[in-house]
Regions:
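Conserved GNAT-fold acetyl-CoA-binding loop/helix
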Residues: 27-46
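Short loop/turn motifs at secondary-structure junctions and domain boundaries
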Residues: 47-52
Length: 161
């Protein structure tokens, strides 16, 4: 199941420059809610909001390659988001799939029963494929304005036990 030797560490401020680079790559953020051209201060604020959440940096050979996590949506009801973002140089290597499987296993071990929610736009074929492989079910669609374009967003859900 886990074959790439990826290491996971809770998000912390020491990865600020890595996140700044990640979130200023147009290809990486085009499928996300991250706006373009984040300042280092804006990056720091986003990162600080994640401290204490179930969000991990992903390391390969001690180098930052991405992030994966399940931020709380409603802790009382055990509802969490689900996302991952990887440096463009790491796309197509299977790391996103492995990290996604890892964080779901982590949630099972540490939270027991929970519901994970993920959103994807149709152009993000690779991510939608990963969600389906992991057992996420499409529960609805909506329209959203992402960076000035109206797109259909597919909403997925996974019950974990």
């Amino acid at each position: 199941m886990f074959e790439y030797g990826l290491v996971y560490r809770l998000v912390n401020i020491t990865f600020l420059n890595d996140f700044h680079d990640l979130w200023n790559d147009e290809e990486v953020i085009k499928y996300t809610a991250v706006r373009e051209n984040l300042s280092l201060y804006d990056t720091q604020q986003r990162l600080m909001n994640w401290i204490g959440e179930t969000i991990f940096v992903v390391l390969k050979d001690n180098e930052f390659i991405g992030v994966v996590g399940c931020p709380s949506v409603n802790k009382k009801n055990r509802e969490y988001g689900f996302f991952y973002q990887f440096k463009r140089s790491e796309w197509g290597k299977g790391y996103a799939s492995e990290a996604a499987e890892w964080v779901i296993a982590y949630m099972r071990r540490n939270y027991g029963t929970a519901v994970l929610y993920a959103d994807v736009i149709p152009d993000n074929i690779a991510s939608e494929k990963i969600l389906k492989h992991l057992g996420f079910i499409n529960i609805s669609k909506s329209k959203a304005n992402i960076k000035g374009n109206t797109v259909t967003v597919k909403h997925y859900k996974l019950n974990i036990e």
